[in-house]
């Protein structure tokens, strides 16, 4: 059984055979679940500032802010 990948940008798990794998020149492997995540990563957007990412939700819990 194939292993599910986790998006390097939003943190969402996605099925094998979908998404995109990007290998940087230093050998680090990045997985993207969608074109949206890939585009935001290369534009330099901070995932902690976008509400739909797992990084935002974890940072919000660490700050203790609840709405």
UniProtKB/Swiss-Prot annotation:
The terms under GO molecular function for this entry are: rRNA binding; structural constituent of ribosome; zinc ion binding
Task: List residues binding Zn(2+).
Answer: 7, 10, 33, 37
Could you tell me what the cofactor note in this record states?
A: Binds 1 zinc ion per subunit.
Cross-referenced NCBIfam families, in alphabetical order? PRK14891.1-1 (NF034186)
| Cellular component, GO annotation | ribonucleoprotein complex; ribosome
Its subunit composition reads: Part of the 50S ribosomal subunit. Forms a cluster with proteins L3 and L14.
Zinc finger feature spans (C4-type): 7-37
Q: Does the keyword Repeat apply?
A: no
Which cofactor is essential here? Zn(2+)
Q: What does this protein do?
A: Binds to the 23S rRNA.
Q: Give the domain of life.
A: Archaea
Q: Mind telling me which CDD domains this protein's record contains?
A: Ribosomal_L24e_L24
Family affiliation = Belongs to the eukaryotic ribosomal protein eL24 family.
* Protein name as it appears in the record: Large ribosomal subunit protein eL24
Q: Identify the InterPro entries for this entry.
A: L24e/L24_sf (IPR038630), Ribosomal_eL24 (IPR056366), Ribosomal_eL24-rel_arc (IPR055345), Ribosomal_eL24-rel_N (IPR000988), Ribosomal_eL24_CS (IPR023442), TRASH_dom (IPR011017)
Q: Which UniProt keywords apply?
A: Metal-binding, Ribonucleoprotein, Ribosomal protein, RNA-binding, rRNA-binding, Zinc, Zinc-finger
According to its UniProt entry, the protein's GO biological process terms are: translation
Could you confirm whether the keyword RNA-binding appears in this record?
yes
């Amino acid at each position: 059984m194939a292993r599910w990948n986790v998006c390097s940008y939003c943190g969402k798990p996605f099925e094998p055979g979908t998404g995109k794998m990007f290998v940087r020149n230093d050998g680090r492997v990045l997985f993207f679940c969608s074109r949206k995540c890939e585009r935001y990563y290369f534009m330099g957007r901070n995932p902690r500032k976008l509400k739909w990412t797992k990084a935002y939700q974890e940072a919000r819990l660490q700050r203790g802010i609840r709405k």
